[in-house]
Amino acid sequence: MTDRAAGPHPLAALTLARFKLTIREPEMVFWVFVFPIVLALALGLAFQTRGEEPVPVAVRDMPGAAPVLAALEQAGGLEAFVTPGEDEAVLLRDGGAHLVVVPGSPPTYRYDAARPESRLARVLVDGALAGAAGHRPPWTARTEEVATPGSRYIDWLIPGLLGMNVMGSSMWGIGFGIVVARSRKLLKRMIATPMRRSHFLASLVLSRLAFLAVEMLALLAFAAWVFGVGNQGGLAALAAVALTGALAFGGIGLLTGSRARTIEGVSGIMNFMMLPMWICSGVFFAVTNFPEAVQPFIRLLPLTALIDALRGVMLNGEALAGVGAELGVLTAWGAVSFALALRVFRWQ
């Protein structure tokens, strides 16, 4: 009785034991202490308070453009520039210009009335031209409302969700599957077979491609049916980009699962790799929200390259040559990851 009374209380001893077990798990320490700080830092950098940015307005390059451009440049809050007529649709779609002024008497405003920033641009341009005349002009500008395919947020979001789906499906389906097989001693049994490691690892990648094709088609069909999201570049180019991305993330998944011993371990490693890309790679908001100093590094992330290539095809109608830089980044990630996975992979 005396010894028991002198020792620690059972509740205190059990609590201390659970605390020690928790802090010995690196994954738990990361999610509890590190991840909230990383998340706050990333989102704080992306949405930090900035000064008021000027509204981009294009002036069609034609007779009469010079005085219009001068009036807009003198007004506050506008960033005016001259553009040839053939570039107007791309500028309006991508946000390079919120409104296009066609010089004339009266001038014509080309803009997408469904976009709030375009409606604001019209008000600012009206005020700038009235101020240049010294009074309210005796004319009312003509308006030419244009519907720019791919200019809605949902059009911009769907390629990001496709890229995120490719990354998650490839990495979890391959890396997690390897660790599960290892924990169940299935890989150990394969040592006695004449199977080559490269064939085994390649089979994991190829099997995931079949599932990925179904997943992508389902999301594309849903987006087209419910929201009217289109694909300007065609299914062949989109499939080629998705395939390159799947192979790249498949190689990364192989690498993460090649040495991990436990399911908890591989889960922590994959979440550590994927969550920063979910935040930084432009899935839900543009990479340009981040400071310019870090944007070159973000552009080198595989998910950033994949999403940029998907958006280039779906929104801009780019051919594969137009997204060659992004495909090169993905190919490099896949080749290096797969080569390293072959070197470090172990059966037990």
Label every PLM stretch briefly:
Residues 1-154, 322-325:
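Extracytoplasmic/periplasmic domains immediately adjacent to an N-terminal transmembrane anchor
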Residues 8, 12, 16-23, 277, ...:
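Membrane-interacting alpha-helical segments
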Residues 34-37, 41-53, 259-300, 304:
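Transmembrane helix segments
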Residues 38-39, 149-225, 277:
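Hydrophobic alpha-helical transmembrane segments of multi-pass membrane transport proteins
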Residues 43-51, 175, 180, 223-231, ...:
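Short helix-capping/hinge motifs at transmembrane helix termini and TM-loop junctions
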Residues 45, 180, 189, 193, ...:
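Transmembrane helix-loop junction
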Residues 98, 147-151, 281-336:
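Membrane-interfacial helix-loop-helix junctions in multi-pass membrane proteins
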Residues 197-270, 275, 320-327, 331-339:
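Alpha-helical transmembrane segments and their short interhelical loops
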